[in-house]
């Protein structure tokens, strides 16, 4: 029933707000890594994928940087962990895109995304989790997809990602937990690539790969929090995790080497929600970034007694929480996995604040 439910769910992900629904791709983890992402070619036009990859490469990575790092990235493939390098080679074969370019793009996504994530608990103890995924490149709207990962013949977990990307920034393990990831660091791209390579050589893992492994392996919310807190990463990140029981919500602020802060829900003292953007929650954001403030004002106005999935969606749809760079919005609850909903935000949000 769960397998069918997830497929129906993700195929009809606009049932609450029926617009801009991404396609769904089923990935069979029982296949060899090289074969897993072959279903991409049944959903996406390969020529369109190649064109989109070219646009991203030319805008994300300056030509001189691509020429400098391309050969180096290829030589570093032996340091990329299983099964991701094999999956990347499989994608390269089906799309006829240089595997080094796909690897570069997979790493570039790690430190160029801006997001808002919210976890909230109502007075009955139900947990709601929502996120906006923001990115400067509109072409990603054409690459956005929902993914259902099957293992041992059953739907194991699901998420939202981009064609050609093997990690997850948004995901759900049904009846266990949901998780989203937000970029933390704001270094220049060149420095990030240098640090990324250094971390790779030191056994650091991309944050989105750790998320995917956690979705696949963690037994419950507590186990997920431990798994997301410990491993060395290639970049700093915020992990926002929500469970199925009252109090199971937390923001994990990660350095490359470990946790910098753990910020749990605390409804007994008024902390019934947590809003995380791309700044440490104990620091003021940039004056030009009002996402956190706007979300908190809206949540306080709604109140814990009235929060639900629809109200959370309304908060995420407000400007400037949603802006012209917002690629997609996801709403999810691990206790009610059929409510997993992703909407592509066509052309972003331009409405005034209310």
What are these regions (language model features)?
Residues 5, 9, 15-114, 215-354:
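C-terminus-biased signal that marks the final domain/tail of proteins
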Residues 104-200, 209:
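Internal mixed beta-strand/loop scaffold within catalytic domains of large alpha/beta enzymes
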